[in-house]
Amino acid sequence: MPKILVDADACPVKAEIKQVAEQFQLDVIFVASFNHYSVNTNGENWIFVDTGKESADMRMMNLANKGDIIVTQDIGLASILLAKGTYVFSNRGELYREEEMSLMLDIRYRHAKERQQGKYSKGPKAMSDQDRVLFKDRMTTFFKNK
């Protein structure tokens, strides 16, 4: 049975993920750095890793199996996990596709270069209640069609 792995450090839709997981009786594993440690995990399955730059990513790569569902905003991690045969959602409910990754990684690279040159672009807009509903609807539809 597939599981849901969540890149939890900055994930704004943890509550929505838990609701969908309960609806479809799926296990959820939240992976976060010790910087986000809490004793209040409410019976959830949390794995805390070192605060190193790629520690959470490495742990998620090791935990992920073909058919698992991943939630991350990290395009680099998404591209690696897609190659493992997982399904990867963004925090906004977009289902990443392997054929899009090359372009997305190129855009990420160009934006990083622009930031190095002192050009700053706006970050993503804040999550609204409507965004949260959309995420939950998209994930629910995915599982209903699976």
From Swiss-Prot:
Q: Which Pfam families match?
A: DUF188
For this protein, the record's InterPro entries field holds: UPF0178
Family named by the database record: Belongs to the UPF0178 family.
Q: What is this protein called?
A: UPF0178 protein Lin1493
Query: Lineage of this protein's species?
Result: Bacteria, Bacillati, Bacillota, Bacilli, Bacillales
